[in-house]
Amino acid sequence: MSASGGQVAANMPANTARRSLPWPAPAKLNLFLHILGRRADGYHELQTCFQFVDLCDEITIDVRMDGRIRRVAEIAGVAEDDDLCVRAARALQTAAACAMGGDIGVLKRIPLGGGLGGGSSDAATCLVALNHLWKLHWPVDALAALGLKLGADVPVFIRGRVAWAEGIGERLTALYPPLAPSESNYLIIKPNIGVDTAGIFQDPELTRNSAPITIHGFLASGGRNDCLSVVRRRHPEVARALDWLSGFGPARLTGTGACVFLGLESTEQGREIVGELPPALKAFLVRGMNDSPLLARLAIG
């Protein structure tokens, strides 16, 4: 199941060099989120574990020889100059002094304002794809550093591996067995609202003094989401969705929401739960992925 989204333009402009196959931009889940403190610059020190899921936006890029960067379809509520894909493309073009451009299409499946990282993932996919299509040969560390300027979540999508994250989310430790989480099935529930991340982190009642934990501690205890109490208070729709989903198991909030999720024993269990879904909620049956599908797409060129 997936949300509907924008369209990709059907016709290739005459000044376009070539059209590539679509590039996936996966959603992520925060399997836990602890906030350790606030830095002098206003950002928060945190710990989290990012895992990808197979709910993906789809990015298409037609390379242009005239240097113009253009979004070829509207995304509701997102102006072109604010679009992270466009900003990512322009940032890479400037940093690399590249004369080429691109027509960028985004087919949205990841809901906006859900805590699933859709915008950051789209930006990361654009950086990885354009680095390949423009033949820049930037190393992944350089791409991740550029991506960090666009958002704290962008580097994990560029690196493409399930990760333990610290700092503002940019200090990443890739996780491999036995430390990697299982690639479980999940049911993600989205209430019909979006959550303003900045508003949650600015709330005076936000927990900001959690003690640091280790990866082994997370694997043993599972952790929690320190944003949960503030999100519940500010957004009753999220609270109701979480309470409903918690009737089927230990439901969690991802990021600052609005999405909540539940690990499943089977896809059949997920389908049974969806059969009882209240009409105000959207459901996404997904599978956890420890390697981003973007890496597989990059491998085929």
Enumerate the predicted regions with their spans.
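Glycine-rich beta-strand-to-loop/alpha-helix junction loops that act as flexible
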Residues: 118-119, 254-258
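Short aromatic/hydrophobic contact patches that present stacked aromatics
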Residues: 113, 188, 259-261
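ATP-dependent small-molecule kinase catalytic core of the GHMP/sugar-kinase superfamily
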Residues: 2-5, 9-24, 30-45, 136-250, ...
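DPxDG-like acidic metal-binding loop motif
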Residues: 114-140, 156-158
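Conserved hydrophobic residues forming the short capping helix/wall of the S-adenosyl-L-methionine
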Residues: 89-93, 131, 249, 274-277
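ATP-binding N-lobe of GHMP and related small-molecule kinases
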Residues: 2-114, 132-140, 178-180, 190-192
